[in-house]
Amino acid sequence: MNAVGALENHDLGALRAQSLLTTQEWSVADLDATRALARALADLDRRGIRTPLCPDELAWAVFFDQSTRTKSAWAGASSRLGMRPVIVDGSSTQVSHGETAVETGAMLGMNAHARGIRHDLILGEGNTFIRDVQQGIDDYLVATGDPRQVPIVNLQCDVDHPTQSIADLLWMEDNLGDLAGKKIAVSWAYSPSYAKPLSVPQGLITLLTRFGADVTLAHPEGYRLTEETMSAAESNAAGGGSFRVVDDMDEAFRDADVVY
């Protein structure tokens, strides 16, 4: 069965208007449907078949940190869907002058059909900010009787980088097949921006453990990830994979199928 035909096996309607704030909040069925849809859209794009599923809708993204790949991906994906991408620097918004996230959400909810936010520089703030923006949008739509639904996509925060983690999962499956029993080493070390890199390994250990992988997290002694994320990875691994933590890179990489 080709990628487009495989969509028959998934409930795509369940994805409609869903915000993606962390992969941990999505069911395995919805994650499966998302990857199937991504494969189908990529296949159609390679064959030159247009997919303007959201014609002339506004896809608004704001970045409070630097980005190359995610900005390009947001613009490319939304354009392929027929949307009009708008990408702004967070420092140019009124947030820099004291406007709250809820107020910003209400303002942007007046026009947007989809929102993307990157807010990853301060540990303990980014994901909360994104949720507050979502609340502002939802409150505005209810107060005005606007029938639109405006989902938010987390384009990297202090907790997770869900779009990158899902893309990494796709690549691994396309190259290795089923990840059950595959050994994956996830490493990370010091960065001048301490909070920023947390979201990448955290996103990987919480997502890959849900798909049966044997995940080893390697980092220098003392550089633990957040307790909530570590607990989630351990809980997810109980469903069929495994999760362990080491501070020795050689041990982590031994017999690994993937080194990240």
Segments predicted by a language model, with ranges:
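Positively charged, low-complexity intrinsically disordered leader regions
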Residues: 1-76
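Residue-level preference for short coil/turn positions at secondary-structure junctions
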Residues: 16, 54-55, 148, 180, ...
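Residue-level detector of flexible, active-site-proximal loop/helix-junction positions
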Residues: 27, 92, 159, 222, ...
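General structural feature for long, well-ordered alpha-helical segments within catalytic domains
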Residues: 30-37, 70, 104, 125, ...
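Generic structural signal for well-ordered alpha-helical scaffold segments
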Residues: 39-46, 169-174, 205
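Alpha-helix termini
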Residues: 44-48, 136-147, 175-178, 235-240
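Phosphate/diphosphate ligand-binding glycine-rich loop within oxidoreductases
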Residues: 52-173
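Glycine-rich phosphate/diphosphate-binding loop of Rossmann-like nucleotide-binding domains
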Residues: 64-79, 173-260
